[in-house]
Amino acid sequence: MRSSWIKPRLGKDNVTQMNFARNGYITEEMDFVAKKENLPPSLIMEEVARGRLIIPANINHLNLEPMSIGVASRCKVNANIGASPNASDINEEVEKLKLAVKYGADTVMDLSTGGVNLDEVRQAIIQESPVPIGTVPVYQALESVHGSIDRLTEDDFLHIIEKHCQQGVDYQTIHAGLLIEHLPKVKGRITGIVSRGGGILAQWMLHHFKQNPLYTRFDDICEIFKKYDCTFSLGDSLRPGCLHDASDDAQLAELKTLGELTRRAWEHNVQVMVEGPGHVPMDQIEFNVRKQMEECSEAPFYVLGPLVTDISPGYDHISSAIGAAMAGWYGTSMLCYVTPKEHLGLPNAEDVREGLIAYKIAAHAADIARHRAGARDRDDELSHARYNFDWNKQFELSLDPERAKQYHDETLPEEIFKKAEFCSMCGPKHCPMNSKISDESLDQLKDKLEECSTSA
């Protein structure tokens, strides 16, 4: 779809959506997004120019259907997939991608760390994906030197970052905000550093006694990104891994640096979103969102959860969806899903489904709470179908139609029950919606009550 859009841009020094927006040009991607979001193209351009909205759209991802992440647009959901040294293969990851897209993932991150050829699995995912693909390049940087921190150089990081851009990756998690002076602040935490990318860079800095190379070479990374229109997803290496560690000095020190880096990327007209926690008590979620907006000049916020309790292994998709809904309500732009396998193992296809639906609920609830135009239309339509016992319409409007139909049919499988004016919960005699009271009857009752009140 995008080949004809991209062709005139080839060879230009800066092909980012932000660069076009700041020069007053509405790209085809901006126009496409405006139609999807039911917003004026001029508003999309203004928000991209301001940095409050991003359109992750690498010029080499030609089959991409552009989408937007920002407070002006709907709250989005990301799904993580990826092979590990102990499980998965390329075909399985492509199937996870297709499942994630089927159940509504707005973006997908390939977090493969081994077990397969990382370049091949990434290329296969990009070729099959209509949604933006994100990656974490430090994983492959370490894998490229066979896990040897002492052999890992600054140029190794930049080489892998550019390779991901060349393949068509739309956004990359760059852990540039973790500085060597932040590391002592981790002392006193229960779970230390829980970011894999952050852990790699912490080891690198401790081993070499040097500043984070992604920070010192940040301008070089910007130069790479603007050639391909790859978007920064600034990683939060010091995100809290438990409630005890939430909103501590380490997390907030890194957040301040992420704000500095956001503005540096904008000087290059490169798009940015900022990643956030993690594990956060409910009473601290609003503070975390507001603090990010303040420090990072309202760049889109992208949070993992957050989980609101630490005692829910096997059900972390529920614990985190609670926090995600709150974060979305307060202004977070994208929610990274958590599956039931979080903290326990590599998710399978069913885990991807469970996590995605939980997060689609959270994002949708946030859009309703923020009074986005049309956000509740589908809910109202389903409610009308429910009141009229239109079972097939109810299934169709559900976030997971297959699951809704499956649960209904467990007790009433025959087709005749798709027209029944009851379900197995109340049965035919006790459903309150079965005894419908007409508007005419209610008007008559109102008149009589008013008569009684007047004559009393």
From Swiss-Prot:
GO MF annotation, one: zinc ion binding
GO cellular component term, pick one: cytosol
Regions crossing the membrane: none
Protein name: Phosphomethylpyrimidine synthase
The record's free-text note on cofactor binding: Binds 1 [4Fe-4S] cluster per subunit. The cluster is coordinated with 3 cysteines and an exchangeable S-adenosyl-L-methionine.
Pathways involved: Cofactor biosynthesis; thiamine diphosphate biosynthesis
EC number: 4.1.99.17
GO biological process per UniProt: thiamine biosynthetic process; thiamine diphosphate biosynthetic process
Pfam families hit by this protein: ThiC_Rad_SAM
Organism of this sequence: Prochlorococcus marinus (strain MIT 9301)
Family: Belongs to the ThiC family.
